[in-house]
Design a protein with these regions (language model features):
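Auxiliary Fe-S-binding modules of radical SAM enzymes
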Residues: 2-45, 54-56, 255-341
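Generic structural signal for well-ordered alpha-helices
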Residues: 98-105, 134-139, 164-168, 203-206, ...
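Hydrophobic faces of well-ordered beta-strands that scaffold small-molecule active sites
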Residues: 56-60, 117-119, 150-152, 176-180, ...
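Conserved C-terminal portion of the radical SAM core fold
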Residues: 200-260, 277-300
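Acidic (Asp/Glu)-rich catalytic clusters
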Residues: 108-112, 137-145, 167-175, 207-211, ...
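Core AdoMet radical
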Residues: 84-104, 108-131, 146-159, 175-201, ...
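Structural recognition of alpha->loop->beta junctions
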Residues: 78, 140-147, 234-249, 321, ...
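N-terminal [4Fe-4S]-dependent radical SAM core
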Residues: 2-118
Length: 341
């Protein structure tokens, strides 16, 4: 794609990606304002484009653990990961999948009526179990009439062939997304956060998932200790250029949560964390680097406020989103502005 200096503000045309019935492919050759009016391809816009209505994600707990917690690779997990396995907002695992879905629906009932949902298995590593355990769990979620898609958070080193085959079968019934927690491409940073696998493991997992026609979403943390801004942009650029193409990305502000190893390190020797303005500046640079057709599933993320140690400003999500939207609009920047391939 040729780099362009045009700004989205000079292009009032609204871009509507091709619907599932049009048979046409989206034209991402020029910077556009997407269907929700934003200059980046938000998850909300993509969901509405695909399903014709607003879709909510329901966080579920499959009752699994993680090889980085059960002693296979380690016992403490990644240093940023809470005791809830990054699924602090998920429904409790001691209830059935259907019961979890209904409880989660009730929590958002004031926001959506007669809607559809993404069943999101979020806590810990959701393919770290035998297929005999996973299949009834995921099948129950997909069978729910209000579930439009299944999303599974996992590690790239926990996708054996029989699990990939299961996910491919489920994907023929309803869309299946696989969310991989990469966080960084830099091996020193990966060792520092105790990620527990090397970059080639991630690369191989993405290739196998894409070969199975599964949707791949990658999590990145911005603000890891001792990483420079240039290194963070290198991670985003790497994902932007990766082949086969990655479908979606989550850009996650580093949250320091009480009860994690990261919080212990921060309290012993505080390290710099982003101010809101610094984070927004970096976020806009990331958006410019991403290909126009990559869906941005997240631009900051949330942690339980009762556990949040830093950065303090991230408690006020509304203030952040308003400030970010204003800064992005005034910058004239748009997704894909600096993307070349």
């Amino acid at each position: 794609m040729k780099q362009t200096t045009q700004t989205y503000l000079s292009l009032p045309e609204t871009f509507h990606p091709a619907s599932t019935t049009s048979g046409k492919q989206p034209d991402f050759s020029m910077p556009r304002c997407y269907s929700d009016g934003r200059p980046y391809y938000s998850l909300n816009a993509w969901l509405k484009d695909q399903f014709g209505q607003k879709i909510y994600k329901l966080a579920l707990d499959g009752g699994m653990t993680c090889p980085n917690r059960d002693g296979t690779l380690g016992t403490g997990g990644c240093i940023f990961c809470s005791h809830g396995g990054s699924g602090d907002f998920a429904e409790p695992a001691h209830t059935s999948v259907t019961e979890q879905i209904e409880a989660a629906k009730a929590r958002v009932a004031n926001k959506i009526k007669d809607g559809k949902y993404v069943a999101y298995f979020q806590s810990y590593t959701n393919t770290y179990a035998p297929v005999s355990y996973l299949e009834p769990l995921f099948s129950e979620a997909i069978a729910h009439p209000d579930v439009a898609a299944l999303s599974i958070g996992t590690r790239p080193d926990c996708l054996p062939p029989d699990v990939l085959e299961l996910l491919a079968r489920l994907n023929r019934r309803k869309p299946v997304w696989v969310e991989l927690g990469l966080q960084t491409i830099h091996e020193e940073s990966a060792a520092r956060i105790q990620r527990g696998y090397s970059l080639p493991v991630f690369e191989n997992a993405v290739r196998e998932l894409k070969a199975a026609d599964l949707t791949v979403i990658v999590h990145v943390i911005l603000g890891l200790p001792d990483e420079t801004k240039a290194q963070m942009l290198d991670t985003v650029r790497y994902l932007a250029d990766f082949q086969p193409a990655i479908d979606g990305i989550k850009l996650q502000l580093l949250h320091i949560l009480r009860g994690t190893k990261l919080a212990e390190l921060y309290e012993q020797a505080p390290f710099p964390v982003f101010s809101m303005d610094e984070y927004i500046e970096l976020l806009i640079e990331c958006i410019r680097l991403l290909p126009p057709d990559m869906v941005i599933h997240r631009i900051s993320g949330d942690g339980p406020k009762k556990l949040l140690v830093a950065p303090e400003w991230s408690r006020n999500k509304r203030a952040f989103l308003n400030t970010f939207s204003k800064a992005l609009r005034e910058s004239g920047c748009f997704q894909g502005q600096d993307f070349t391939n």
